Amino acid sequence: MIIIKSDPEVDLMRQAGRITAGARTVARQMVEPGVTTRQINREVHKFITKSGASPCFMTDGGFPTAACISVNDEIIHGVPGDRVLHEGDIVSVDVGARYRGFNGDCAGTFPCGKCSDEALRLIRVTRQSFFEGIQFARVGYRISDIGHAVQEYAESYGYSLVREYVGHGVGAGLHEAPEIPNYGKPGHGPRLQKNMTIAVEPMVNVGGYEVRVLDNGWTVVTADGSLSAHYENSLLVTDGEPEILTFADDI
């Protein structure tokens, strides 16, 4: 069931979104050669709790850490640990914060030091595909209109869109209805309504869209070992343009 938020609930979503966006910025600022993914996660966790929120990937999603940190061919759900980042890596950080019963969810992929032109282009295209998609995150459009726009843009650069993992509603639940695929034909699915809150999150691969899950039961990687990038924000559907609840100028 799609949950339409009340105005007071929207205000709480805004506060959760600001904290979540701040945590993502903390992570971005730490991405550099020699840093471990565990160190990044520790600072993300600290920022969330000091902001009066809780790390909802742990409390709601059962994930072992506050942040998912995925490197190179890892798409999502990378588990932070002793892995050391190296020059040329691309690092996807997905974070979530729960504030007074409501969740924010956002992600971004960041270059570690000097990266290849191909890697930087992938990051740029993935980010822009999000903005292409949310042009249709407006009252009256259908859910598939978002994913169709994401797919058209990313595929125009020769990339593929992950199909087994999708965007979603977000609110009191970390993952709510509806599911929001990053591909498909336009004109399908529920119509968007004012005060829906959703997370749109393109996951874009240089190679094919097929994926596999590592033995840890969490980390999803590209089946062909190609690079992958991820960009996500939580949104509020309004009477006009969508409001990005997890917006940050630097990401």
Feature map (PLM): residue ranges:
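Active-site neighborhoods and metal-handling regions in enzymes and metal-associated proteins
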Residues: 1-251
